[in-house]
From Swiss-Prot:
This is Centrosomal protein of 170 kDa. Phosphorylated; probably by PLK1. It comes from Mus musculus (Mouse). It comes from the Eukaryota. Interacts with CCDC68 and CCDC120; leading to recruitment to centrosomes. Interacts with PLK1. Interacts with NIN. Interacts with FHDC1. Interacts with CCDC61. Interacts with TBK1; efficient complex formation may be dependent on the presence of CCDC61. The modification Phosphoserine is found at residues 141, 355, 358, 443, 463, 494, 568, 577, 628, 631, 662, 718, 829, 870, 872, 922, 925, 950, 1008, 1048, 1102, 1104, 1122-1123, 1135, 1150, 1155, 1188, 1195, 1200, 1229, 1231, 1241, 1260, 1270, 1362, 1521-1522. Its main location: cytoplasm. Residues 1075-1093, 1112-1128, 1158-1173 have a biased composition (Low complexity).
Amino acid sequence: MSLTSWFLVSSGGTRHRLPREMIFVGRDDCELMLQSRSVDKQHAVINYDASMDEHLVKDLGSLNGTFVNDVRIPEQTYITLKLEDKLRFGYDTNLFTVVRGEMRVPEEALKHEKFTIQLQLSQKSSESELPKSASAKGTDSKVEAAAEVQPRATEALKSEEKPMDVSAMPRGTPLYGQPSWWGDAEEDEQRAFKANGKPEGKSQEAGASGCSTEAKHVEGQSAAASEEALFPFCREPSYFEIPTKEFQQPSQIAESTIHEIPTKDTPSSHTAGAGHASFTIEFDDSTPGKVTIRDHVTKFTSDQRHKSKKASPGTQDLPGIQTGMMAPENKVADWLAQNNPPQMVWERTEEDSKSIKSDVPVYLKRLKGNKHDDGTQSDSENAGAHRRCSKRATLEEHLRRHHSEQKKKAQSTEKHQEQAATSSTHHRGGHGVPHGKLLKQKSEEPSVSLPFLQTALLRSSGSLGHRPSQEMDVMLKNQATSASSEKDNDDDQSDKGTYTIELENPNSEEVEARKMIDKVFGVDDNQDYNRPIINEKHKGLIKDWALNSAAVVMEERKPLSTPGFHNSEEAISSSGSKRWVSQWASLAANHTRHDPEERLMELSATVENETDTGDAGVSLRSTSCTTSLASQGERKRRTLPQLPNEEKLLESSRAKVVPQRSEIGEKQDTELQEKEAQVYQSEKHDADRGLSKMSRAVNGESPKTGGDGKALLHSGSSSSKEKSETEKETSLVKQTLAKMQQQEQKEQAQWTPTKFPSKNALGHIDKCREESSKQESQLLEKVSGHSTSKGDRVIQNESKRRKAEEIPKCQASKGDKKESSKSLVRQGSFTIDKPSSNIPIELIPHINKQNSSVPTALALTSASRLRERSDSLDTDSSMDTTLILKDTEAVMAFLEAKLREDNNKTDEGPDTPSYNRDNSISPESDVDTASTISLVTGETERKSTQKRKSFTSLYKDRCSTSSPSKDVTKSGSREKIEKKAKSRSADIGARADGRKFVQSSGRIRQPSIDLTDDDQTSSVPHSAISDIMSSDQETYSCKSHGRTPLTSADEHNIHSKLEGGKATKSKTSPVASGSTSKSTTLPRPRPTRTSLLRRARLGEASDSELADADKASVASEVSTTSSTSKPPTGRRTISRIDLLAQPRRTRLGSLSARSDSEATISRSSASARTAEAVIRSGARLVPSDKLSPRTRANSISRLSDSKVKSMSSTHGSPSVNSRWRRFPTDYASTSEDEFGSNRNSPKHTRLRTSPALKTTRMQSTGSAMPASSSFKHRIKEQEDYIRDWTAHREEIARISQDLALIAREINDVAGEIDSVTSSGTAPSTTVSTAATTPGSAIDTREEVGDLHGEMHKLVDRVFDESLNFRKIPPLVHSKTPEGNNGRSVDSRPQPAEHPDHLTITRRRTWSRDEVMGDNLLLSSVFQFSRKIRQSIDKTAGKIRILFKDKDRNWDDIENKLRAESEVPIVKTSSMEISSILQELKRVEKQLQVINAMIDPDGTLEALNNMGFPNAILPSPPKQKSSPVNNHSSPSQTPALCPPETRALHPAAAGVAAAASTEFENAESEADFSIHFNRFNPDGEEEDVTVHE
């Protein structure tokens, strides 16, 4: 029979017959199902006006509206559909065209549709629609089916018309996360399901009675059969066509029977039709639209079902059409048979209505893996329905099946997990039923009672979470219902594999499909990915889960302070969301990723389990309510993938690297803690430094099991250690199981509050957490007391020592708790957990490269390390500690204020830093974490230093260091610093951005960045670090290159530093620089003291590249040179100094090659500079003058002794000393080991600082590296340069600096630094030092300013640095903050005074390292000096060429200069030294000649002396030339040189002549550098002014 019917023809060509009744259009249980998420579940209604025989569409107030002819129709208003009207629902890709046409409806189909023949023939579609509505609701569902059959018959017509349409048919927008392949075979079904599933849903809803159930049976079964039948009948297979087929014969029966069939399994036709279709559709009255399809077909084999389906279709279908229809129908039937469509259907329906995740949950149910947590729908959602319906049983079956699978996968893990899970899970199992209900409630009724939600959420979160997975395992075992509700979690958490819940007849195909879907949605994580990952993680994570019980409590507590995290965790808590999100987020995030709280719980559980037992119960219970609420939210949030791919990746990395609780606790902890801890960052960093160590120890569980060192090492080598940790944690799990049980209850109490992310609650909980954290830390001390208590107490004592301990002690408690709760977050490096904004850097396992050598965190963690550091600090401890205590008090006050501020900010936007950090850390987690680890390690160590410096000092340093270095960057840096100081957490992102920006612009700003590097080292490691990153990365070749790999690491460092807190910042900057470089090589065996010393002496390359001392010497030099020149090298050709130093490079392997390895060293140098700058600024700020000399002496002694012996003592001492002043407390205070671990890079830097001083000269050249580009320019633009005084002066300045570098290096090598430094080397050293430290900044500027800026920068840097090195006095520092590079004249004189000590110290240090340093340095210095001489000869020749047209008596000048400058070679035991001295003297002469050539009458010098300050300010390079020279000379040359001379003379009184010569060179260099500034077209001169 043919019916004239209205059709909606989708853009895909699918015809949907519009039944003559009202049909719903939407995503859920609608007659017309659209998959687009822009379509509401009930989006619109298409009604039929029988009188007018027209259809009207009414938008049901949908979010995205309904569009007729692209005009949005008013809501709740019927709009008549006319022919060819284009109908669009929401933004669904299907554009439906209203078509009226004949639809041939087979009698069977009409009968099947419950169309009586009269309806079929007389009423046709209208009657069918009427009967549909008129029919009993069973009939209604059938009629809906019929009505849909008509639209779908229309579709079927289309299908008939285009049997290919079903497959070709637009399947609707795939569900989010749905692969395009979904429904290829299923699409027909999906269509059928779309037609029959959703309409069924409606029908079911409408005929909530068995009719709908039957309809669903019929629909599900008939979907294929009916499709075939309908295809003949022009019905799309997407209609209830399997039933049609079945019912075409049975349909006739079904007409009558179908009304009966709506009973569970009216066998009329679908029983016969599709054995698999035999299922009971149970409507959950409590959940309208939720139909539980009990698959009786599970009893049927897929083949049986398939055969039944096909049999009924074959039997019923028209042979001709049936054959045509059979392909799609068979497709559908096959799919249905294979995929247990009944299960799919009920799953679909339940999930559809229930599924928050899926646009078209029904489709998801259809989807093969839809039963499992698809990205779109989670089993939890299904579980919600099934919990109400049979879904629970099915889920239990699936859970059993999946868990059996997972068990197999995770059994080893499960064993541990089950231990924890049985305890915790049984514990939670007690809550299992409520949890299942709660899961439903959470999914459906977020406002479910908090107690249940708490339990359920704890469970749900736990189930979803890692621990809950265990719980789920047990719960599922214990409670099938609970398992159903938690099945999603279990499926999600199936990783445990502990679930014995198995489907009666788990359909392997269905499982396969589910797995595919799960895989698509990341749910597969549950089964395969998550489980295996989790299994690895679970080894530790299971313990973590056991701990998670405790950790959940902690986590809940933490999420309290981290509302966002709660949401995340909530989303994670949502079983499906967590699950599939977890895979999407990352396999690693499986356990750690989604439930930040959970992660926190897990990690926290590890650490906190002990503490949480006592503490968590208190705080967590208070947080319990919020947690529950949050969990509900999470439940809902599960709808969407909670973890971004980045986070997933991060988490995945984290899970992989810190597969267990580090990432779990860390990430969750990190996010939470970051919010909390950012407030506490400095304090907490202090506390967290210890706590981090403790946390790591706890996380590594080594503290629990062994020592902090082990724990940290475990965290550091998380995979290997965590395995042991897993076992350790197994016992811990056992230990914590009781705690977990307690804590689980606590968690239940606490979970809700934790998830209740109100800021008040956060603050309140923070307090509670602090208290509980304190308790926890105490508990940790008690429980983990083996090492943890030692580490904690040591940490706490250390914190007390630091005075930061006071707040950090609270925060150490907090930090303990937090860090306990947050085992280190393997952000960036191991776990690519998205560095939560809440994650304080402490939480991030900042495994220094030196963590390998002396895991800073470990060092800090270990009481011995802490005490070593204290001892080393004690060396400077009396001063450092006093200063630190004072500073710490100031910092504490500041931090307290800031904590309050940050608590607000953290609550508000702690994510920003986290994400900024994520920006740096997440993507580059390995590098970043390496950086972060080094940073944190450095931070931890630096924290003490920085804590010693008051945060204010640090802040000042930050500001001051930034400001001198860059005007722009200075402003940006300073602003950033201030912002960071103000809102460290909030600004961490900005800092990272600023850092990135600085990196972008920092190359011009880099000098300031370099200073910022100092600043970074200082209190402003955020900005400083970003600056360091940019300046190190960009400015310091070594830094740049060393850091460039670490850029992310640097960013991470920055983030870490930013978050790491102030104290950590001081340390971290240097360590971050060096450590970052080492971080880059993070997975490095822990350096031995020997390695550290060797590296310190020879540079990091010594371990790998530098086998011989010469190489080592070269390495240290080159590292600095390389770092200095490297960025130019990277950007430009090797700078002059690099060229000069090239032999060394060659020795090193290649200076450029060295750059990378030196990048570490140079970065270390940069870091050292940073640290030095910081220490300079910080020490100065912190009356580091007294401290600095002592610190310098101590640190230099230590450094010299341990690491920078030769370099440090020689030229290294002054530069190192200044640097040490920068890191005075850090370096002086920390012991050699700490020095190695903390300042391993810094030491290297210091070493490199001496070689780096040489290299610094090289850096001058390195900064001259831009100069080398400039050199090329000079070569290229020789004429231009000839015309350009700037170029000449640059050349001259470069040469002078080369000479200075060579002289300084020679002096250093010769050990005559004292004498030479006094006269010649002092400027040289100054130049070298300046080049090394400020020079980094100068390098940046130089790069910018090319030769002009270069020389100026180099000279400025040299002078400033020498001044800085010498004048670390706070007074100088205060000025230095304004101009770190261009230290004011005042700052120079002061350093000049201090350099006496420095020089002396350097001399003493040198005596220790003299032999090695001599040997190593001499050859390299010799080569370097030769290169410098050659370079200067070339330069002199070039200058001659440049000035050949000037009327100058070059020969006279040269002769005069030679005669004057002929200083008798200092008699030394080393021919190399003599040669070096000769070379340097030649260079000196050449430089003097050049100086004479350039400024034969001394006009420039006079101008420089007179107008140098002004000269800096003038932007015209040439005008600058004169003024700059004036400025430079008086400022730098006169003021600087004499002080330096004075400073150096006491130490270097021996070689006054050489020193004089070098001083002259330095003076000329100063002039040149000033000229350089003048010539600096980039306005670096202004920077110089600022600096100066």
